Amino acid sequence: MEVALPNVPTKMQHPFTKYSEWKFKLFRVKSLERRPSEEETEGSEVSYNSSQETYPKSTVVLEDLSLGSAPQSPTNFKPQQSEKSNVVDNHETDLKRLEEEAHITVIQQLCRICGASFKMDQQNRSYPVHGPVDSETHDILRRREKKVTSWPELISKVFKTDVRADVDTIHPTQFCHNCWTIMNQKFSNISSEVYFPHNQAVEWTPHSANCYVCHSSKPWGKRKSAPQLNPHKMKKRKRGPEFVKKSKTSSGNSIQWKNMKAFNQMKDSCKKIHLDNNLLVLDYPSDFVKSVSCLVCEHILSDPVQTSCKHLFCRICILKYIKLMGCYCPSCKYPCFPTDLTVPVKSYLNVLNALLLKCTVSGCDEEISLGKYSHHISKHKETKGKEVYAHINKGGRPRQHLLTLTRRAQKHRLRELKMQVKAFADKEEEGDVKSVCLTLFLLALRARNEHRQADELEAIMEGRGAGLHPAVCLAIRVNTFLSCSQYHKMYRTVKATTGRQIFQPLHALRNAEKALIPGYHTFEWRPPLKNVSTRTDVGIIDGLSGLNQSLDEYPVDTISKRFRYDAALVSALKDMEEDILEGLKAQDLDDYVSGPFTVVVKESCDGMGDVSEKHGSGPPVPEKAVRFSFTVMNISVPNKNGPVRIFEETKPNSELCCKPLCLMLADESDHETLTAILSPLIAEREAMKTAELLLEMGGILRNFKFSFRGTGYDEKLVREVEGLEASGSLYICTLCDATRLEAAQNLVNHSITRSHCENLQRYEMWRSNPHHESPDELRDRVKGVSAKPFIETLPSIDALHCDIGNAAEFYRIFQLEIGELYKNLSATKEEKKRWQATLDNHIRKRMNLKPIMRMNGNFARKLMSKETVEAVCELVPCEERQAALTELMDLYLKMKPVWRSSCPAKECPELLCQYSFHSQRFAELLSTKFKYRYEGKITNYFHKTLAHVPEIIERDGSIGAWASEGNESGNKLFRRFRKMNARQSKFYEMEDVLKHHWLYTSKYLQKFMNAHNNLKNQGFTVDLDNPDLEQRLESSMESLESMEF
């Protein structure tokens, strides 16, 4: 960098014109007149451009600044006025420009926030004040759900400094790594040794004659300048003592001095409320005394709190210190905020409360432990108060009645009485002040013959008040889909209308729901579960917890919340505790049977499309969701004559028993995301297969074993999790190895051959190709396995999706029969669309069935009926085709109950026996009358319906009971809970939906809700004295039930 001085004499040219990075070589031109500070002292002013004054001749002195000091400001020196005023003006302009450039160069090497030099950091790291935050900070803010994306916003939040209106000539444009670390540490849990060097951010001012940045007397680090080259040319004026320059304290030091003064006053005031460590009875080591003393006031700790750097203070002392001196630890200068303060561990508090102290009351020589010291002192005050207490009215305003006073005045007037009641409660009732006061109130009511209020108070004291049980209120809130705010409004309305607390407040409901959410009950596994924590107080966790860090190469863009599988099963069993104990009694078994109980669990998983919401903050995630749930199907216990079933789910396809386990905003087709979320859950499931659960139930420790059956999957998801090709594959079935052609040629005679273990073996063969076969030969060997299976499913048929798939095929057959495709196999697409429109219009008129874009369960149930076939036959001209179509539907309706019923052996034994005959006749019709459609091909669900139903029922006893219908119904609840009961945030809404859905499936709450509904149906009302209030309460309850939230 070269600097030229135009219009400057040759003798004033600088010998060096290049500047290094750390050293500046500047001219200093000094005049023989006084400095500006001296002129201010003497009360005179001198103007540079004044033509009326005569300036003596100046000399040029070259000064070399030492390393690390700021360049000397040329404003301390005045050039001599020459004979030509324009030359002087040019000199002044050039010097001002040079000093402003030097000022800007200096401030660009300083931090905008704390003013520290970047050279203090060995790596010379700095960050721009204006602009977006860096990637590391952005990730931290994203995890903490902060919307801040730029440095000015973040600096404003952390340091309370607005940098948006900064000017480059006044303010630095960079900040240091120390301030960057403080900002990151504010929003993360990572601690590091960093502290803010000042109590407040530096205030920057424009460059002036007394600029503390450029001037040699800057407040943070003045260094002695190099010796002058020509000291004999400088003339020092003699000055009297009245002109000696007073040392000026900077504004920062003044503020610090005031803060220190306030801090000392605070320490003095602590003597009145805190105990000095000289009161300790024993002669403890000095280090121990320090460990039990506050590091601010140096007294014994009172209400101790611990900072994140593990230092201990009195709560009031550290809060006052932070307010006065800044948010950092007084001991180590580590950043410390009031929200970071925590209570020390209980063992330390026990040691602290056990310290023996001398009583400060004169005449008392007792030695009291610190924990009982306040109680001991209160006894002295009580004794003194009894001696001197007497009501004295010294005139002035008359004493008002107690009930007309404010709460603060009531406390003041009743203070002595409160102390006496507390002393009595501590002595006689183990400190139960509430019971003493309630009993006094009860006796006062009885003495005044106010027995009605006394009865109500007594009922409240005994826990049998007129209000509803908190569990009933919680059941009402969950089953009516009320959010917390809606319930609170209803609670206040009913309380204000009736004057009674019929419903319980929200905090009572939250206490009730804690015992119903997983993570409340303690349990143990033998042997301990592999790779699963032994903690039992685990509630809702992030869906990605337990995921290996090696998966960071694939970004998982999803939000997922789940329960830990074992904790969820424990909570479900405790929720069914009454049912299990009643089952033992019903089977004439002893109540103290310890097991082992065998619990059979049905697992279901399904994807949901289009769950997008207009609201919610957070990262962009797919607008699809996946739900994983389970249902406890039955529980059995071994007996002499074999296992005895003590519990069986009566409605296995109800949404009331299908408990949610995991929710995620993801696409079920995204194999990587699905694997990342469900793999930890599946690992917990595999670990539980070989372990026994020890759980206390009915006061006895009992053993439980679990059997998991993955049957609630549709065909698409089965192929996804078992590593099979998609549903359009050549290999048509997920239960056997038949190809589509083999299934069409032999419609009935097939058996289940696939299994999870075999799919794993075939995947290894597909991956390694040990026989070095061609792709077609290898595919034929592995029978359609193309990915690694990661969830074990039971080879079965999902009854709900079987209905939907078969109904879609019948819907297609109806269209083709209307168009008589058997006559003309080369029909165009326009003709087929016309046939579909004709069918839709006809069944809309006759059956009131509106056409839909995608087949669902309700449409399938209405479509598959005799009425529908009769309506379709009106559009089929040929009577022979009408008879074939009617017979085909009749056979289907005879087969359907076999796979739809929960127990076909009890519900439809005749149809179960005739199933093979009906399936043979159904297959015969397809291969003859409907040969035009099923020659050489067959649909997936027709194949499963005709070939595999008898074998599955023989193995499991039912197909319908193991269907995914409960999980499908849970999908509707997911949408409703997300809309009504969840916070509007992508992170928190999943947690809220999971919690509310779990409470909705609680059998404990369902019993309370059923009992409440029975009482309401029987005409049960609250016994109120005022009939008008009763009518208003009933009308408010009716309006509540009629509300559509």
From Swiss-Prot:
Please tell me where Zn(2+) 4 binds in this chain.
359, 364, 376, 380
**GO annotations under biological process?**
adaptive immune response; B cell differentiation; chromatin organization; T cell differentiation in thymus; V(D)J recombination
Where's the DNA-binding part? 395-462
Where can this protein be found?
Nucleus
Q: Which residues bind Zn(2+) 3?
A: 309, 311, 329, 332
One GO cellular component term noted in the UniProt record for this chain: DNA recombinase complex
* InterPro entries associated with the record: RAG1, RAG1_imp-bd, RAG1_Znf, RAG_nonamer-bd_dom, Znf_C2H2_sf, Znf_C3HC4_RING-type, Znf_RING, Znf_RING/FYVE/PHD
> Tissue specificity, please?
Expressed within the thymus, liver and spleen in juvenile frogs, and within the thymus and bone marrow of adults.
> Which PROSITE patterns does UniProt cross-reference here?
NBD, ZF_RAG1, ZF_RING_1, ZF_RING_2
Q: Where does a divalent metal cation bind?
A: 606, 714, 968
Pfam families for this protein: RAG1 (PF12940), RAG1_imp_bd (PF12560), zf-C3HC4 (PF00097), zf-RAG1 (PF10426)
Catalytic activity line of the entry: S-ubiquitinyl-[E2 ubiquitin-conjugating enzyme]-L-cysteine + [acceptor protein]-L-lysine = [E2 ubiquitin-conjugating enzyme]-L-cysteine + N(6)-ubiquitinyl-[acceptor protein]-L-lysine
**Similarity section:** Belongs to the RAG1 family.
The UniProt comment on domains reads:
The RING-type zinc finger mediates the E3 ubiquitin-protein ligase activity. The NBD (nonamer binding) DNA-binding domain mediates the specific binding to the nonamer RSS motif by forming a tightly interwoven homodimer that binds and synapses 2 nonamer elements, with each NBD making contact with both DNA molecules. Each RSS is composed of well-conserved heptamer (consensus 5'-CACAGTG-3') and nonamer (consensus 5'-ACAAAAACC-3') sequences separated by a spacer of either 12 bp or 23 bp.
Q: Subunit details for this protein?
A: Homodimer. Component of the RAG complex composed of core components rag1 and rag2.
The protein's name in its UniProt record: V(D)J recombination-activating protein 1
- Give the organism, scientific name: Xenopus laevis (African clawed frog)
* Gene that this polypeptide is encoded by: rag1
